[in-house]
Curated annotation (Swiss-Prot):
Belongs to the MraZ family. Forms oligomers. The keyword Repeat applies. PANTHER family: TRANSCRIPTIONAL REGULATOR MRAZ. This is Transcriptional regulator MraZ. InterPro entries: MraZ (IPR003444), MraZ_C (IPR035644), MraZ_dom (IPR020603), MraZ_N (IPR035642), MraZ_sf (IPR038619), SpoVT-AbrB_dom (IPR007159), SpoVT-AbrB_sf (IPR037914). The gene is mraZ. CDD domains: MraZ_C, MraZ_N. GO terms for molecular function: DNA-binding transcription factor activity; transcription cis-regulatory region binding. It comes from the Bacteria. It comes from Syntrophobacter fumaroxidans (strain DSM 10017 / MPOB). The keyword Secreted does not apply.
Length: 150
């Protein structure tokens, strides 16, 4: 099937120390095709988790941007500066740093959503609200996607 991607959804529970078990199918993608670690950063109401090799592509592209543009500096402060490398413990869990847990309002029930080269980490209730909005806008989303050739 070619290059492996993160696909599907999985619901997990964050433990009291802020550790999150990563689904086996996501771990297998990492172990078989990437370094077995994650770089996690914030994006709006969720967190994004990247294999280090995919994250490196983002950093390389970001280095090409002009340092004087306010939008670039804001991107670097918001997205790049919040990135944390997280390694797995021997039970397949990562420790999400407190400031990132707070940013995404991660308390207990967490949904992981595979989106190809990375996956999103959501508070389950926040995810449910976003999916409802997406369903309400489904026709517009499909028209947009048709315009992209998909």
């Amino acid at each position: 099937m070619g290059k492996p991607y993160f696909r599907g959804q999985s619901i997990h529970r964050l433990d009291a120390k802020g550790r999150l078990r990563i689904p086996t199918k996501f771990r297998e993608v990492l172990q078989n095709h990437y370094t077995d670690a994650l770089v996690i950063t914030r994006m709006g109401e969720c967190l994004l988790a990247y294999p280090p090799e995919e994250w490196e592509k983002i950093e390389n592209k970001a280095r090409e941007f002009s340092q004087v543009q306010p939008e670039h500096r804001a991107f670097m402060r918001y997205f790049i500066s919040s990135a944390e490398e997280c390694e797995f413990d021997n039970q397949g869990r990562i420790l999400i740093p407190p400031f990132l847990r707070e940013e995404a309002n991660l308390t207990q029930d967490v949904l992981l959503a595979g989106v190809l080269t990375n996956f999103e980490i959501w508070n389950k209730s926040t995810w449910d609200a976003h999916i409802k909005l997406d369903k309400d806008s489904y026709q517009k989303i499909m028209e947009f996607m048709a315009g992209t050739g998909l």
